[in-house]
Amino acid sequence: MALVAGSAAYQVLRGVTGTFPTQSATLLARAPALCARTLNRRRMSSRRQTDHLERTANTFRQEIISPAKVCEITNESATVKRVRLAIANREFTFKAGQWVDFFIPGVPKVGGFSICSCPGLLETEGVLELAVKYNLHPPAHWIHSQCTLGSEVAVRVGGEFCFDPQPSDLPLDLVLIAGGVGINPLFSILLHVADLHKTHEMTGRGFQMGNVKLYYCAKNTGELLFKRNILDLVKSFPGKITCSFHVTQQSSPVCVELQPFITEGRITEKDLASYVSTDQLCYICGPPPMIESTCKQLESLHVPKEQILFEKWW
């Protein structure tokens, strides 16, 4: 289950003014509209809370709560179900990287799940997707044990961790770093990046997206969510979208198709150093310890703190 706790201190909200470090001035001048919230790094190690609404009480939410109906359920992995929801309210929108409050009739607890589909899918088909890992928390347990085609729920968008460039913004390169089911919001961003590339290639208009690299770590290849979709994007946008998969407990042979993209072991500073530069924006999502170590690695590579955005899941 992917739940929001915050992002790093990168303040590029539309309409927000402030003083930024000189070393980031050039990037800030070219930065697109990003959603982010200042977060004291000490909160990274704060005690775990179990309630999504408590954790996100001070986080932005839209006013619209839309009815939704489950229209497709698939097994993304042995432990993760991918759920497609048909959204009833046509005014309902979201930005790549955001999440939803998930309301289930008869279940008192409200779920909080990152959206793994892109805004374009909602615009064209009226649906969004969630990928939910099994656990005993009531909303996640309901999805794995009781949710069926036609089940009715309600959703509300929230979150300040997103990528929403405007057509007039200058090109920008991204680094996406995911751990486990922390891939969800980053996959949404990656799909949105692909849509931006398609739009610019077909029309010559809109935001001109730079290059993106995804680093994604999971226990084994079976737990690498969306891996086929990700490889399809890499093939469709050679050089513009690249990826590096990392596995920490792989016990079976890796299939031939995945082998060129697989590295055994966690994502290290050396891995990041081969690609990361000081003029990129870095998005991180995963367990708090993974975020803490990755932030330190990026700072060691001289990436300004203002260019490191993160979101925790629990």
Swiss-Prot record:
Does this entry carry the keyword Signal?
Answer: yes
Q: Where is the signal peptide?
A: 1-18
| Entry's EC annotation | 1.-.-.-
The family database entries (PROSITE patterns) matched by this protein are listed as:
FAD_FR
Q: Which SUPFAM superfamilies match?
A: Ferredoxin reductase-like, C-terminal NADP-linked domain, Riboflavin synthase domain-like
Which InterPro entries does the annotation name? Answer: FAD-bd_FR_type, FNR_nucleotide-bd, Oxidoreductase_NAD-binding, OxRdtase_FAD/NAD-bd, Riboflavin_synthase-like_b-brl
Domain annotation FAD-binding FR-type: ranges: 63-166
Which key words tag this protein in UniProt? NAD, Oxidoreductase, Signal
**Alphabetized GO MF terms:** oxidoreductase activity
Give the residues the record marks as binding NAD(+): 180-185
Q: Give the protein name, as stated in the record.
A: Oxidoreductase NAD-binding domain-containing protein 1
Origin species, per record, is Xenopus tropicalis (Western clawed frog)
| Gene (name only) | oxnad1
